[in-house]
């Protein structure tokens, strides 16, 4: 594993206890220039995770706590008239940062959700006819409460598709919970976190991730998996071409963290559930049976032959 990557993980895991796998997946998503949706109950460390990543990676960060009265201009900014200059001046919103923590994104209106998610896809915002590019890198770590919680608005599938991966933090195990209590007993662990890389060094790691090689056998495997989701009897809407591209990007990051400059089929299989579960729309029968997308994807992985790469 790259030494810088190892140092990043070590520093983050000193705060985010017992969640090493999720920490690695979030770092992969950042290296793949993707956005992360963390879905879980309150109090399991979603916000702390986002703040820790921002600090360790040397990124500017801002936070939006979404509520029912959050409006699009809070996120993307607005124009105000400057009398002295006799012109309108752009006042940036929270989105003009490197890492945006979008807290409880499903508690706000569809209009505000759309403003954020369009900017996530296009990496720019348009206000009063003027277009403004977002900073580089730009990553959104969004949190949402489980569907059905009071005051939540379901994200449409087209908007869920903008997130590279969806994760659930889950409750810590017994030992990790004790460590969390011990760490927070006398101080906030975030106070002792130090930046491990600069913004420019992070961008170099992003470029190295992009340079990871993948061949036609890998592309064929990804395509076959995506097609299998579209024809599965329990799936109404499967993985889109954008989802297949996301799978390749995340697999490159998985290979990079594994110390390789090329993708193997195991990279695809490892990230398949996290990249694709939130992109599936299950059939009425599947929903009635309370079937889970993750179980369907596991079944598809078993049914599709993994290619053997030639040396």
Functional labels for PLM-detected ranges:
Residues 231-311:
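C-terminal engagement/docking regions of AAA+ P-loop ATPases
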Residues 41, 75, 143:
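P-loop (Walker A) phosphate-binding loop of NTP-binding proteins
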Residues 40, 103-104, 115:
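Walker B catalytic acidic pair
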Residues 30-67:
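Walker A/P-loop
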Residues 82-85, 108, 112, 120-212, ...:
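Canonical AAA+ ATPase core
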Residues 24-28, 81-101, 130:
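Conserved alpha-helical scaffold flanking the Walker A/P-loop in AAA+ ATPase domains
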Residues 56-84:
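AAA+/P-loop NTPase substrate/partner-engagement loops
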Residues 2-44:
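Pre-Walker A (pre-P-loop) alpha-helix and adjacent loop at the N terminus of AAA/AAA+ ATPase modules
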């Amino acid at each position: 594993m790259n030494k810088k990557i190892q140092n990043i993980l070590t520093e983050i895991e000193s705060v985010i206890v017992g969640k090493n796998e999720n920490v690695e997946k979030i770092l992969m998503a950042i290296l793949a220039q993707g956005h992360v949706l963390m879905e879980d109950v309150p109090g399991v460390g979603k916000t702390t995770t986002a703040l820790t990543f921002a600090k360790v990676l040397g990124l500017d960060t801002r936070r939006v706590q979404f509520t029912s009265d959050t409006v699009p201009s809070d996120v993307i900014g607005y124009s105000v008239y400057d009398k002295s200059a006799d012109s309108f001046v752009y006042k940036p919103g929270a989105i003009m940062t490197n890492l945006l923590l979008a807290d409880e994104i499903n508690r706000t209106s569809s209009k505000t959700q759309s403003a954020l998610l369009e900017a996530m896809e296009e990496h720019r915002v348009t206000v009063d006819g003027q277009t403004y590019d977002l900073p580089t890198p730009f990553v959104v770590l969004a949190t949402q409460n489980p569907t059905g919680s009071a005051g939540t608005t379901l994200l449409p599938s087209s908007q869920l598709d903008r997130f590279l991966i969806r994760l659930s933090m889950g409750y810590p195990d017994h030992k990790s919970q004790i460590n969390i209590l011990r760490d927070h007993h006398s101080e906030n662990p975030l106070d002792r976190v130090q930046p491990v890389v600069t913004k420019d060094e992070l961008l170099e790691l992003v470029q190295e991730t992009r340079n990871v090689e993948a061949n036609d056998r890998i592309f064929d495997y990804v395509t076959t998996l995506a097609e299998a989701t579209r024809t599965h009897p329990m799936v109404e809407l499967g993985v889109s071409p954008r989802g297949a591209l996301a799978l390749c990007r995340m697999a490159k990051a998985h290979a990079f963290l594994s110390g390789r400059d090329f993708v193997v089929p195991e990279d695809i299989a490892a990230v398949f559930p996290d990249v694709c579960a939130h992109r599936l729309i299950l059939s009425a029968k599947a929903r009635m049976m309370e079937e889970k997308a993750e179980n369907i994807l596991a079944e598809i992985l078993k049914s599709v032959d993994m290619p053997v790469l030639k040396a």
